[in-house]
A protein has these predicted regions:
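Conserved N-terminal diphosphate/IPP-binding helix and adjacent helical/loop segment
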Residues: 1-88, 92, 98, 105-106, ...
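Alpha-helical membrane-inserting segments
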Residues: 28, 95, 137-141
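A general secondary-structure boundary signal
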Residues: 34-35, 140, 144
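All-alpha helical catalytic cores of prenyl diphosphate-utilizing isoprenoid enzymes
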Residues: 42, 59-61, 124-131, 135-136, ...
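Active-site alpha-helical segments that house and flank conserved acidic catalytic motifs
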Residues: 82-105, 158-172, 197-198
């Protein structure tokens, strides 16, 4: 009788992440383009589309999409729906960075070593690009040809809206802006950062 323990195949996080990141990049490239089925084929001005693409396709760690795809893998969920949700979270993140960098917020001129969207395209286009990225995120969660029920689509939209809205990221940013020059307790800082990260 063979008493040796068979070694289970270990999950290769690095390989899995690289594959997911490649798929996320391709999906973002497909959905944030002038030919995209998710709404940008309606004659969006070229500069707006260019600003949106600049904001989203400029790299980044893509941690949020990886977390969504990891959750999908853990529960053996629908990979197509998960990719849409993964990209939606990245679009929300990108829109928040575009707005956060603007002069009325943090007035950053560089992001990831490149001029911020408002520096490259102007404030008005940056604001609209951020707004359009946010709208596109919700559109990705509600495809016309969805293989998952409308009630689930609505629930996903509700969750994302809460995480990004006044009870989440936007609320945290409002606290951040209101507290400039103020001394915050560790608890207040923690609460603000928890809200800002959705």
């Amino acid at each position: 009788m063979d008493t040796r323990v068979k070694t289970a195949t270990l999950f290769d996080l690095r390989s899995w992440s690289a594959g997911c990141l490649d798929r996320v990049e391709r999906a973002l490239e497909r959905w944030v383009t002038a030919e995209a089925p998710a709404g940008l084929d309606h004659g969006a001005p070229a500069e707006l589309v260019e600003a949106m693409r600049y904001a989203v396709l400029d790299g980044g760690k893509r941690l949020r999409p990886l977390l969504v795809l990891a959750a999908c893998k853990a529960v053996q969920g629908n990979e197509g729906a998960a990719m849409r949700a993964a990209c939606a979270t990245e679009l929300i993140h990108a829109y928040s960075l575009v707005h956060d960098d603007m002069p009325c917020m943090d007035n950053d001129i560089l992001r990831r070593g490149k001029p911020t969207v408002h520096v490259k395209f102007g404030e008005a286009t940056a604001l609209l690009a951020g707004d359009a990225l946010q709208a596109l995120a919700f559109e990705l969660l509600t495809p016309e040809d969805a293989t998952f029920p409308a009630a689930m689509q609505a629930q996903l939209c509700r969750l994302l809206a809460r995480a990004a809205g006044s009870a989440g990221m936007a609320g945290g940013q409002a606290i951040d802006l209101a507290s400039v020059g103020e001394r915050l307790s560790e608890r207040q800082l923690r609460d603000m950062h928890e809200l800002k990260t959705g």
